């Protein structure tokens, strides 16, 4: 891998700085499709609410993320950034941001060793300073500091890695501790809080909080309505099929497509495949989600039933081994298998290691079973929309990243209002604010309640309009 790193110019590791001009041109286009972030820049640029914030960012290094980074910087923050997935970086985006002087450590197709090296680097600030905020996607940056600090006290927590990724992570922590036995606890103590982007990372935060292990306050950005009901649903509805088609050129119409999981992500995936006239089958563990799928006209089955019949498989559960080797052995020749959940273990990719692998092109592999049958595995089981395409469109990411920016401001400027070890969601009025910022771009006009109407339903004229338990 021909990474570019030039300490004399800037602190970065990217694939090719010659791509910076291309990245800058795409950033300019993305800004026109990200009204929420641009409005927040305008609102807060003068007051600089993030002045003094040193943000360690671990989130897909895409063009849209570049607009987020430059928004954080415009509001006064200093930022160091790595991608949260080995395949999701857009190299021209990384180069464009590095060219501005913001440290970026991200290359599309980086190794696991490089991934954890780069995640360490977002916590290695110059002049003896340290990060005081984390912006996370999937929880790896948060995990790294907590696990490393535990290992300082008890190295046996690194004794039994459960996967190849854990083996690499544990080795990286041991190597770091050999250089500096207090590396992790020193940095952990400086963190005011984390804002977490995605479902998987949020699950980790709640688990840590319940166990009393979370060392700072957290804001769950994922469960803002203007994130989960937009990014997860409408974003996946457009980016899933983009990834599958770029990877395989498959005709979706008429095929049987299985979507594992019918949460917000699964709903978007099922809608996209159905819109292209696939026969969509859904697997679910939750009777409520299963009933929703059935009443949308989708066939609800088990993976054991579906494996031998379907042409396309998509995992969207956030769970573990949803598709096993046994399932894949039962599949048709040339079945397409992919994942749109955060981690690569929804599909038992490790269980395929002793099969023959044949790369068709980057992030597209034939996995050949002993009987000669082949399946097409996309992005090695990692996020198909980012591994095989460019992820969600800019507009929907503006909504997600507006939430991230507001959450960073909230947690940094009002840190005393948030209890260490607890996980919070943004209040409803901020959720509604994010939605308002995006209406004009779509030509949408809000109606306004009269005082009498507001009194009749018991809400303020200016909102919030729904109680916290409302599900949208």
Swiss-Prot record:
May play a key role in the regulation of the intracellular concentration of adenosylhomocysteine. Binds 1 NAD(+) per subunit. InterPro entries: Adenosylhomocyst_ase-like_sf (IPR042172), Adenosylhomocysteinase-like (IPR000043), Ado_hCys_hydrolase_NAD-bd (IPR015878), NAD(P)-bd_dom_sf (IPR036291), S-Ado-L-homoCys_hydrolase_CS (IPR020082). It catalyses: S-adenosyl-L-homocysteine + H2O = L-homocysteine + adenosine. PROSITE patterns: ADOHCYASE_1 (PS00738), ADOHCYASE_2 (PS00739). One of its GO terms (cellular component) is cytosol. Its main location: cytoplasm. This is Adenosylhomocysteinase. The keyword Lipoprotein does not apply. Belongs to the adenosylhomocysteinase family. Pfam families: AdoHcyase, AdoHcyase_NAD. It is found in: Cytoplasm. It comes from Bordetella parapertussis (strain 12822 / ATCC BAA-587 / NCTC 13253). Pathway: Amino-acid biosynthesis; L-homocysteine biosynthesis; L-homocysteine from S-adenosyl-L-homocysteine: step 1/1. Its EC number is 3.13.2.1. Substrate binds at residues 62, 137, 197, 227, 231.
